[in-house]
Amino acid sequence: MVIGGGLTGCEIAYDLYLQGKEPVIVEMQNDLIAVKGVCLANSSFLRDFFNANKVPVHLETKLSEIMEDGVMVTDKEGNTFKIDADNVILSIGYNPAPLVEKGKHIHVIGDAKKVGNLRTVIWGAWDVAMKL
């Protein structure tokens, strides 16, 4: 059971499937990997892979409770139901802490600044390095 259908959650579910597990994805948004800046080839591949391999994906569904033998979730119509699971992996978003205000020698880069990809992280690090 993977709670969170962002890039990390989808990559975890993909890896679990390749290991012979039976992952289930629960995502609050109306699509998997619903964030800008992610490589279209990667996100399209993962969506197509889950569809072709019949990996259960519950979109617009919220986690209500984690239990010993599964989770309770609520869909967009307000229906609450149980999904059996041996393990639950939380791959959910978070609100970043504003470090910039806490020190003058702090440079926020990468996903801490804005979700992107390896190229945007490297460019951001290069920009900061050139200013030092």
Where on the chain are the PLM-derived regions?
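A residue-level detector for conformationally permissive "hinge/kink" positions
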Residues: 1, 83-85, 108
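Rossmann-fold NAD(P) dinucleotide-binding segment
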Residues: 101-103
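Hydrophobic anchor at the start of a short beta-strand
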Residues: 23, 106-107
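A conserved FAD-binding loop/helix module that cradles the flavin
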Residues: 9-16, 35-42, 107-132
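A Rossmann-like FAD-binding core segment of flavoenzymes
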Residues: 18-99
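Glycine-rich Rossmann-fold phosphate-binding loop(s) that bind the pyrophosphate
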Residues: 3-7
